[in-house]
Amino acid sequence: MDVYEAVTSRRAVRGFTDQPVPREVLERVLTAAAWSPSGSNIQPWNTYVVTGAPLAELKKLAVERVATGVPWDEREYEMYPPAMKSPYRERRSAFGKERYGALGIAREDWEARQRAAIANWDCFGAPAALFVYIDRDLGPAQWADLGMYLQTVMLLLRAEGLHSLSLIHI
């Protein structure tokens, strides 16, 4: 698969099979992704791969915690600006309508929307999860580096015939 096909066929998948991702595929992807650009080549990302029983346990604990309604630690930043401007607000709204509509969930069905949201913490059934972090003392330029790294990882996964989804929090 060439890079154009990888880019245009990449989708944010929210439903995975339980078929394991071979270790050699993950190693190949992460080895190549290490070539991602970063300012002054500091490569600020740290990647942890979790699969198998440890991932199953982590997902189970996360889903149980979310289901209790007990909040996680306070967020260090807002996911979206409180007063998001046009056209971004409309795009986000359209995505929500499309997603919940495809799941047959009405806007006013808060319980069903919450159940659908909990699937985030199960990683939508993915058999592998990559947790990627940067040092919290780094700044916006390193967040951009991280974004380039994540895009590279997702395109390399696509080139391997796999789909992926980036989650901001779990």
Positions of predicted regions on the chain:
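Covalent nucleotidyltransferase
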Residues: 33
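Short loop-to-beta-strand entry elements in the cores of soluble alpha/beta enzymes
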Residues: 40-51
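Glycine/small-residue-rich phosphate/adenosyl-binding loop
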Residues: 49-139
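A short secondary-structure junction signal
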Residues: 141-145
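Conserved small/polar residues in nucleotide/adenosyl-binding loops
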Residues: 169-170
